[in-house]
Amino acid sequence: MPAPRLDVLEKIKLLESKGEFDQHINPIDYDIAISVDNFNYIKKGLERIKVFFQNTFIVKPYTLYLNKKIIKTKVLGRHYLNGIDSAIVTCNHVYIYDCLVAKYGLRGHRLKITAAEFNNRKGFLGEMMRAGGMMPFSSKYENMKRFNYAMKYYLERKNYILFYPEEAMWHMYDKPRPYKKGAFHYAVKFGVPVIPMFITFRNSGKINQDGMEEKYFILHIMKPIFAKEELDAKQNIEYMRQKNYQMCCDKYQEFYGKKLKI
């Protein structure tokens, strides 16, 4: 279960001071996780039909409701998606449902969402996450072979695939955190651009039960990053990672009007 919001702030403050930006704030409940061993990354037959109806009648309507009525998401920069059929998409991880913020911002494009394997969970929420396009990583080699095949399959068929390069979710944390290289490895491996996104917050004027002000969202879609022909694979991974992170740092400073301090 999520920790109380004030407790979350204290944990974030502590981890920030220690420079441990990829640590999880909420405890991970492995008891509700389902093994990825039998996860179908590419849905077929009756499962594909089931997922279609779940996505059409539950996931999509809730995505619209959440973004229009609850967090009142504004999307900036959708013109950068023009002409980009397949891509790796990155975003800061700041909200339990920020994958739905990404879905809303990227509407009109098919989106798959990478996730830690413990997110493949039991119950209704797990069902909806799978219907919404979740692709869990795995600690097992054989499962990652299937994951990698699915990556290739979807990118060849005009899909976007979302990565959270910060790894852990920090609730309503406004600063960009250091990026891992996984997303950029796949962009270089499959020859697709990276579309950087960054979520910022605006005040709602509403106070929640913890005495904290609720936030409204702005999703910034930024200019795609392409690999450079003159660089080898390793160099391009690092170039794209650094470029993406710097773009998010610049967006933070532009939006909030203050220098980034970590």
Q: Which residues does each predicted region cover?
A:
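Membrane-anchoring hydrophobic helices of lipid-metabolizing enzymes
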Residues: M1-I88, Y97-V101
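A conditional alpha-helix N-cap/helix-loop micro-motif detector
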Residues: I71, K140-M144, P176-R177
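Catalytic core of membrane glycerolipid acyltransferases/transacylases, capturing the structured
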Residues: G83-Y141
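Short amphipathic alpha-helical segments and helix-helix/interface helices
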Residues: T63, A102-K103, G126, M151, ...
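Non-catalytic C-terminal accessory region of glycerolipid acyltransferases
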Residues: M1-I25, N148-I262
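Short, charge-rich binding segments
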Residues: Y80-G83, Y104-G105, K152-E156
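A generic secondary-structure micro-motif detector
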Residues: F52, T114-A115, K140, M172-D174
